[in-house]
Design a protein with these regions (language model features):
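SIR2/sirtuin-family catalytic core signature
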Residues: 1-16, 152-153, 205-316
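Acidic, metal/cofactor-coordinating or nucleic-acid-engaging core segments within structured domains
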Residues: 39-52, 174-213, 226, 262, ...
Length: 316
């Protein structure tokens, strides 16, 4: 059983220096090539119902957008396709995934992580942690490769260490991209290949790993609705237990992203106030302020690192 769970989202890669935002991807040569090929694949009268046109329109409205959120909107609002359109959309969706994989492989090829970044420093220090730990990746990249760190189950400082890639990885050349069925929605069977659960093919025990951990760290993950199924039991238990046995640290960019995360948690029926009442500690660390040498944020960061390196401490 891992006593420490580190949950990593795309913000972790961004902190490390990778241009891995979806808005970066849609400006890439890989996406432009995908876009051109998809336009040629459809008849003119079919293009209006295509996924590529939906993504184009969404990006035109905002330079920042989430492809998976747009896929969800597309699945919810588009039905009644004939067999030909379903085949074309399936092909289009598969080509989108290939384009994303090719883009991420290109930008990670020979990438050197900035060792002064918090993300990099955290992974190095985690190897000195005396607690059994699990790293849970919601992104597709393998930062351990940039840092020349092991990728499989290992023993560090006498403690076991596990790695889980929830949505696949570039190393496996297989990624999970799409959306999940939200509460109250009906399955769109014509486009069900876009649901993430239909792309999963092995158990990962993520929910149990987080629930069992006593030290939980989110870095660069928005704790959004799409992924909340993995966190729900943990947050329910953490907000309800009168025995404060857990430390929760959420590392995010700034105050606005902190508010968004709190709103996301509250929207899932979890009281943020109860989390503050029932966790041993709940801290938000803003990377922007740490880099700006803010004394309060630096103190919170140093307290976290010290706790990671200490075997006997409160709450564990």
């Amino acid at each position: 059983m891992a006593l420490l769970a580190l949950i990593l989202g795309n913000g972790f890669d961004i902190d490390m220096g990778l241009p891995s935002k979806y808005s970066d991807f849609v400006q890439s040569p890989e996406y432009k090539d995908f876009e051109d090929r998809m336009h040629k694949m459809y008849y003119k009268e079919e293009l209006g119902k295509s996924l590529i046109l939906h993504l184009q329109n969404a990006y035109a409205k905002s330079n920042w957008f989430d492809i998976e959120e747009e896929i969800h909107k597309y699945v919810v609002t588009n039905k009644g396709f004939d067999d030909r359109m379903i085949r074309l959309i399936r092909s289009e969706f598969n080509e989108l995934k290939k384009a994303l994989v090719n883009y991420l492989k290109r930008i990670t090829n020979n990438f050197t992580a900035n060792k002064e970044k918090l993300s990099t420093y955290l992974l190095y220090r985690l190897r000195e942690c005396p607690l059994a730990a699990t790293e849970i990746y919601f992104n597709y990249t393998n930062p351990n490769e940039y840092l020349k760190l092991p990728l499989q189950k290992e023993i560090f400082n006498g403690a076991q260490h596990w790695f889980t890639y929830v949505h696949g990885s570039l190393r496996e050349d297989d990624i999970v991209l799409g959306c999940d069925l939200q509460e109250g929605e009906n399955v769109n069977r014509q486009l069900s290949f876009m649901y993430k659960y239909n792309q999963l093919n092995k158990a990962n025990h993520v929910a149990r790993s987080i629930l069992e951990a006593k030290e939980i760290i989110f870095f660069g993950h928005s704790i959004n609705e799409m992924d909340f199924c993995y966190f729900k039991e943990f947050f329910k238990a953490a907000s309800a237990s009168p025995n404060p046995i857990r430390h929760l640290t959420i590392i995010t960019y700034d105050e606005e992203s902190e508010r968004n995360i709190k709103d996301n948690i509250r929207n899932q029926g979890i009281s943020v106030t109860d989390l503050y009442n029932n966790l041993w500690t709940l801290e938000f660390i803003h990377t922007q302020k740490v880099y700006e040498k803010d004394e309060i944020e630096i103190k919170k960061w140093n307290t976290l690192i010290l706790r990671l390196l200490t075997k006997d401490r409160q709450g564990i």
